[in-house]
């Protein structure tokens, strides 16, 4: 394969990746948008998101206590970092993301799972190897 066609293939793949990552956010929210009656906000959002990600990891062959083996940040630290990210996003005039999608609007369980980090082979194999 020539260099130019390789470059074109990589550029096309990158373009498709960027397009897919932006298409997952269906809404744009404003600061004064009210919360959806069935939306999850604040610590409820954090807890539910963490629960769904752990369930998805377990379903794909990981374990719920895999964080200790991979030296993942503690749940309290993740929660603080997540809440600070939500506050930073709220300062913007229009924002997208899990707070907009699942607090101001209603998210299905599958939409919550879409915000989970991908389960890698190393996370599944390291938990089963111990």
Swiss-Prot record:
<feature type="region of interest" description="Disordered">
    <location>
        <begin position="54"/>
        <end position="74"/>
    </location>
</feature>
<comment type="subunit">
    <text>Heterodimer of A and B chains; disulfide-linked.</text>
</comment>
<dbReference type="GO" id="GO:0006006">
    <property type="term" value="P:glucose metabolic process"/>
</dbReference>
<keyword id="KW-0301">Gamma-carboxyglutamic acid</keyword>
<keyword id="KW-0119">Carbohydrate metabolism</keyword>
<keyword id="KW-0372">Hormone</keyword>
<dbReference type="InterPro" id="IPR016724">
    <property type="entry name" value="Insulin-rel_pep"/>
</dbReference>
<feature type="modified residue" description="4-carboxyglutamate; partial">
    <location>
        <position position="111"/>
    </location>
</feature>
<feature type="disulfide bond" description="Interchain (between B and A chains)">
    <location>
        <begin position="53"/>
        <end position="116"/>
    </location>
</feature>
<keyword id="KW-0313">Glucose metabolism</keyword>
<dbReference type="InterPro" id="IPR036438">
    <property type="entry name" value="Insulin-like_sf"/>
</dbReference>
<feature type="disulfide bond">
    <location>
        <begin position="102"/>
        <end position="107"/>
    </location>
</feature>
<keyword id="KW-0379">Hydroxylation</keyword>
<feature type="modified residue" description="4-hydroxyproline; partial">
    <location>
        <position position="34"/>
    </location>
</feature>
<feature type="propeptide" description="C peptide">
    <location>
        <begin position="59"/>
        <end position="92"/>
    </location>
</feature>
<keyword id="KW-0732">Signal</keyword>
<feature type="disulfide bond">
    <location>
        <begin position="29"/>
        <end position="100"/>
    </location>
</feature>
<dbReference type="GO" id="GO:0005179">
    <property type="term" value="F:hormone activity"/>
</dbReference>
<keyword id="KW-0964">Secreted</keyword>
<protein>
    <recommendedName>
        <fullName>Con-Ins G2</fullName>
    </recommendedName>
</protein>
<dbReference type="GO" id="GO:0005576">
    <property type="term" value="C:extracellular region"/>
</dbReference>
<keyword id="KW-1015">Disulfide bond</keyword>
<dbReference type="GO" id="GO:0090729">
    <property type="term" value="F:toxin activity"/>
</dbReference>
<dbReference type="InterPro" id="IPR022353">
    <property type="entry name" value="Insulin_CS"/>
</dbReference>
<comment type="function">
    <text>This venom insulin, from a fish-hunting cone snail, facilitates prey capture by rapidly inducing hypoglycemic shock. Intraperitoneal injection of this peptide into zebrafish lowers blood glucose with the same potency than human insulin. In vivo, when applied to water, this peptide reduces overall locomotor activity of zebrafish larvae, observed as a significant decrease in the percentage of time spent swimming and movement frequency.</text>
</comment>
<feature type="disulfide bond" description="Interchain (between B and A chains)">
    <location>
        <begin position="41"/>
        <end position="103"/>
    </location>
</feature>
<feature type="signal peptide">
    <location>
        <begin position="1"/>
        <end position="24"/>
    </location>
</feature>
<comment type="similarity">
    <text>Belongs to the insulin family.</text>
</comment>
<keyword id="KW-0165">Cleavage on pair of basic residues</keyword>
<keyword id="KW-0800">Toxin</keyword>
């Amino acid at each position: 394969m020539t260099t130019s066609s390789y470059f074109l293939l990589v550029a096309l793949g990158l373009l498709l990746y960027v397009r897919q990552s932006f298409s997952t956010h269906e809404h744009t929210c404003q600061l004064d948008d009210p919360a959806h009656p069935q939306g999850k906000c604040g610590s409820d959002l954090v807890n539910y998101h963490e629960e769904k990600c752990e369930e998805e990891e377990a379903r794909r062959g990981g374990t719920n206590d895999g964080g200790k083996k991979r030296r993942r940040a503690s749940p309290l630290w993740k929660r603080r970092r997540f809440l600070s990210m939500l506050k930073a996003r709220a300062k913007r005039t229009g924002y997208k993301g899990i707070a907009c999608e699942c607090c101001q609007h209603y998210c299905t369980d599958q939409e919550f799972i879409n915000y989970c980090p991908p389960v890698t082979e190393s996370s599944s194999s390291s938990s089963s190897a111990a």
